[in-house]
Structure formats: structure tokens, C-alpha cells
């Protein structure tokens, strides 16, 4: 069991500051509904139904990226899931936010603006330093308690995650509670047969380090997505495409090149790379090319190819456990969902312990009608889930544990 207090311990009639993780895919400037809203709505609804005055914090994207937007649209989606109004204020801790907080009645819910629009939020720092920021020092006196429900961001040392538990009684929400217990159990479980990890997605930096750290737990890695392209480049293939209109791929390559080459050198026999990739052909249909036939860097490889999918299925079927972090392609486009869906279907039909992690991958399960019950656990966490596999500490969990019993 976790060593932190939960919302079961929250005093009645509290004004609570609740940290969620509503970070979502953005299409045409609008957030897309996903399981994070559904899961966090359970915590918000429970708090509001109990008569607490509920003020929510969350983030979306990072400054400078296309998905860095206001949370105004998130409030509408969350309200649909909670089943009651969720007011929104385009401010984090200024006068407008403080006035809206002060006016909040019992059972009412308010969402503050994107925490990453606050200068105090993003730079990673120790909790003691974050607790002294103007952001925390201004907001904290307005509340009786702090609730962290953002397990998927628990590996970050951001002000909204690690600062408030040092100055307020702190509790875990339902998502934090259930994800922590599930992922802790995963990290300590032993398996009799082969353990396979499917690695994809666009955020490769955290995963590459974990691949190195999981050397003694994972027997084979099946790669796709950006991580797969990074390893293909290390193997001498001219691949790698721009992400979200930026040079994020090249940034991840430069940041991780030495580690990638080291992992490939030491664990090359355990790492399966794509042998073909899919892209949009001249007629707009899905087209595929063998990796060995790629002779120059081309933007736009959007999925692993059919040969790769077929090659990934047997090791999955032979596994005692399969962990998934990230999608193998741009599954939001049906033309490039084959890799992600094919691997998930192979896992679902295998009698093994299986965990699917990451908000995008769990969204694929919903989009393509897969049965969540066919997997041992479906986590909305990405980076935190990966770190839990290695037993690495999660800063936001550590401060909750340190705050236990403080009321």
C-alpha cells in the first residue's frame, strides 16, 4: 500500500487545489477527448459531490510547441465527463484567479489556466525551491488542502507537482492512488518466461535511458515510432523526421546519440528494429519501403511496415510479460494505425501479463475498439510508468509520502 494520505482522509468542507494531467492531443487548435479526462473526472466528481470547493490545475504542451495552448477547451470536455459545470479562468495566480477562487461555492469546480504559462512552473528544481516560488506562495493560502491526481506527471519536479505538498496538507486523488499501486506492483513482479517491451511514441528521451536501465529485466525490445527511427539512424539508416513542426527529432538525436549507440552496441541482439516503414504515397494511400532501400533522409515515415508487424508478433506470443510504451505509428490516421493496432491485438490474444502505458497508446485501444479487459493494466501514465518499471523514485510521490499525516 502507498505511504501517502488519500482523499478518503480529506477533512469535510475543504477548499482543495487539485493537480490533474489533462495534456492531450491537439487538432486544429482544439484538445481531443481521451481517457485522461474520463479517469480524472472520477476524482473531481467525488470531491464535488462531497461538497468540497474544487480548484483544478493542469498543463498542456510546452512553450514553443504547437500543442502549447490554453485550457479553456479542456474545461468543456472535463465538464462532460464530470457531469457538472467546470468554470474556467484564464489566469493561474493573479487577481482574476484569486477572485474566482474566492467566489467558489460548495460543490463547484474551477479550472485555472495552463500551469506552464506560469514562469515558476517549468524549470525543474528541488521541492524546497519550488515551494518558495511566487506561484506556490500566492495560491497556497487560498486552500485548506492540496490533492495530486497527476501520476502521469509524477516524475517531474515542477512547482504544481512538488511545491504545494510542502506548504499544505497533501493527498492523493483516485488516479494517483490506483496508478501508483498498479505500477509499483509491476516493478516488483517476477516473471518465469521472456519479458518483451514495445517502445514507440514521440518522446524517446526518457525511454532510451530506461532501456539501458532495464537491461536485466527485459529480454527483447521491439522498436517503432521516434525511438525506432533514432535507433535506425544509429544503425546507419538515413531516417528521422520533424516532429510537430519543430526539429525535435534532431534534438533528441543529439541529446541521446551516445547512449543510443551504447545500448545498441551492448544489447543489439535483444533489440528488434523495423525492416520496413510506411509513408503517404503519391496517391494519398499507405505505401511502404524496405529500410535497406532508403538512401536519403525523408520526412514522413508514419508507421512500421507490414513485414515488421509480422516479425513482431511471434516474440509477443512467446512472452510471459509484455510492456508497451508508446505507439509504433501515427495511429490517429487509420492509414498508419497498422503497427500500433497489430501489436496491441497480438498482445490481447496472448496469455501473458501485459501493461500498456502512455496516454496516446491507451487512446488507441479505445479508438480501434479493443477490449481493455484483454490487458492486465492500461495506464494513462507515460514517463512515470516507465520510471516505475525501473524502481526510480518519483518526486511528486515522494513529497506526498513526506506530507502523510500532516493535517
Swiss-Prot record:
Compartments in which it is found: Cytoplasm
Enzyme class: transferase
A molecular function GO annotation: phosphoglycerate kinase activity
Organism name: Halorubrum lacusprofundi (strain ATCC 49239 / DSM 5036 / JCM 8891 / ACAM 34)
GO BP terms, alphabetized: gluconeogenesis; glycolytic process
EC assignment: 2.7.2.3
HAMAP family, per the entry: Phosphoglyc_kinase (MF_00145)
Protein name in UniProt: Phosphoglycerate kinase
Family indicated by similarity: Belongs to the phosphoglycerate kinase family.
Assembly, per entry: Monomer.
Binding locations of substrate: 21-23, 36, 59-62, 116, 156
Amino acid at each position: 500500500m502507498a505511504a501517502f494520505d488519500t482523499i478518503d482522509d480529506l477533512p469535510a468542507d475543504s477548499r482543495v487545489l487539485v493537480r490533474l494531467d489533462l495534456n492531450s492531443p491537439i487538432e486544429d487548435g482544439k484538445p481531443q477527448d481521451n481517457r485522461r479526462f474520463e479517469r480524472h473526472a472520477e476524482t473531481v466528481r467525488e470531491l464535488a459531490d462531497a461538497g468540497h470547493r474544487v480548484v483544478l490545475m493542469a498543463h498542456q504542451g510546452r512553450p514553443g510547441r504547437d500543442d502549447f495552448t490554453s485550457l479553456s477547451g479542456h474545461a468543456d470536455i472535463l465538464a462532460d465527463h464530470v457531469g457538472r459545470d467546470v468554470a474556467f479562468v484564464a489566469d493561474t495566480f493573479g487577481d482574476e484567479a484569486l477572485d474566482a477562487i474566492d467566489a467558489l461555492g460548495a460543490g463547484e469546480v474551477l479550472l485555472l489556466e495552463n500551469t506552464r504559462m506560469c514562469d515558476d512552473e517549468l524549470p525543474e528544481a528541488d521541492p524546497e525551491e519550488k515551494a518558495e516560488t511566487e506561484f506556490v506562495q500566492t495560491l497556497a493560502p487560498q486552500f485548506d488542502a492540496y490533492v495530486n491526481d497527476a501520476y502521469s506527471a509524477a516524475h517531474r519536479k515542477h512547482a504544481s507537482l512538488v511545491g504545494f505538498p510542502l506548504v499544505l496538507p497533501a493527498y492523493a486523488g483516485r488516479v494517483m492512488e490506483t496508478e501508483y499501486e498498479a505500477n509499483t506492483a509491476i516493478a516488483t513482479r517476477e516473471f518465469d518466461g521472456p519479458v518483451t517491451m514495445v517502445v514507440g511514441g514521440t518522446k524517446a528521451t526518457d525511454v532510451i535511458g530506461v532501456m539501458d536501465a532495464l537491461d536485466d529485466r527485459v529480454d527483447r525490445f521491439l522498436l517503432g515510432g521516434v525511438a525506432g527511427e533514432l535507433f535506425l539512424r544509429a544503425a546507419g539508416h538515413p531516417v528521422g523526421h520533424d516532429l510537430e513542426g519543430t526539429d525535435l527529432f534532431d534534438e533528441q538525436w543529439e541529446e541521446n546519440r551516445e547512449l543510443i549507440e551504447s545500448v545498441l552496441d551492448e544489447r543489439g541482439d535483444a533489440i528488434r528494429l523495423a525492416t520496413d516503414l510506411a509513408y503517404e504515397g503519391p496517391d494519398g494511400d499507405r505505401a511502404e519501403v524496405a529500410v535497406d532501400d532508403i538512401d536519403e533522409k525523408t520526412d514522413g515515415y508514419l508507421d512500421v511496415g507490414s513485414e515488421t508487424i509480422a516479425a513482431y508478433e511471434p516474440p509477443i506470443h512467446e512472452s510471459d510479460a509484455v510492456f508497451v510504451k508508446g505507439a509504433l505509428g501515427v495511429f490517429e490516421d487509420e492509414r498508419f494505425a497498422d503497427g500500433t493496432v497489430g501489436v496491441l491485438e497480438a498482445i490481447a490474444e496472448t496469455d501473458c501479463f501485459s501493461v500498456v502505458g502512455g496516454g496516446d497508446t491507451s487512446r488507441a485501444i479505445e479508438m480501434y475498439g479493443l477490449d481493455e479487459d484483454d490487458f492486465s493494466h492500461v495506464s494513462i501514465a507515460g514517463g512515470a510508468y516507465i520510471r516505475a518499471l525501473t524502481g526510480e523514485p518519483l518526486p511528486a510521490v515522494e513529497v506526498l509520502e513526506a506530507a502523510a499525516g500532516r493535517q
